[in-house]
Amino acid sequence: YMPEKGLTYRSEVMSFLGAQLYERFRSPELRSLVDHFSRQKDAPPQVSAMVRRVESNYIYINKIPQAEYQAYIALIAKAEQVWEQAREANDFQRFAPYLERIVDTLRAFAGYWGYKAEPYDALMSFYEPGTTVQQMDRLADELKHFVIDLFQTLQARGMPCGEPAEGRFRLPLEEQRALSQYVLETIGFDFASGRLDEGPHPTTLAASPGDVRVITSYQAEDFRSGLFNTLHEGGMGLYEQDIDPALLGMLLGEVASFATELAEARLYENIIGRSAGFWEYLFPRMQQLCPSLAVDERETLFQSVNQVRPTLIRNNADELTYILHILIRYEVEKDLMV
């Protein structure tokens, strides 16, 4: 974590580095190199892909005024730390001014980049190239109706389990840490090329395939939250560790897209982590690692992680209603860009 007094200087350094990157991407030399290699019809596919990536970055950066680009880099560096403090204090107003400035900046960037139909198209194209708001609206509408209809059907049939008894899924943090370590080892995460840490919010950080940091978070009163956080981020970590090291230094040694990375995370979290086979495998070892576990039947745990019970917290959402959290965020982001 970043010590509070280190925040200001860190933001200044990131702004400086952003300026260096900006100047390099605006240089005539880079434009000349891109043009040269774009004409090489017999170039290896990795080189052609790298040239396309460099040209895309060149176009995006060159449309933004340098002062605004530097200010944005400094803003997001500071905003992340303020968000962490606001979250800890449960004080949204502390973070609100930073969020407002970020949204205003992205609106301006969308104007610089240009769009055909909606401002959010500019950001969609940046984060998921080739995707449009029109496509996403159609997909979101189909998903929304499917999820809500299925949820209502499940409600009518009655949930497979009632509300859990208070304290039933409580586990000491040390036992949860041991469980998360074991689960990552089980799915193939290479601890010689990564590590498991704790933070205020689950995430995965990767400097290279040989340095992948899975960051999880735990709830003492319900071990399932930490377990599925770890499976989710572990899926991302495996993706990062499987990137070909030969692509490093070519702007290609990173995830292909946010959607691809999240699909890997959801695969391990849900398709594997909520399967009967997974719990048949995990439960005996879990009983050894977690002597405080109050649940003595594998089937009870298996059913508990497959219940559908809406929650306001996305990280604690079940497999079905999690999708609604994503759809709501999509609609909010789209509206903010107008």
Model-based region annotation:
Residues 128, 148, 152-155, 159, ...:
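Hydrophobic/aromatic-lined pockets within catalytic cores
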Residues 1-129:
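A well-structured
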Residues 192-193, 246-250, 273-284:
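Acidic/polar loop patches that form or flank catalytic/metal-binding clefts of enzymes
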Residues 114, 214, 218-248, 262-269:
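Active-site recognition of the HExxH zinc-binding catalytic motif
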Residues 72-223:
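Contiguous, non-catalytic segments that form substrate-binding/exosite surfaces or channel walls
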Residues 274-338:
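Long, amphipathic alpha-helical stalk/connector segments used for oligomerization, subunit docking
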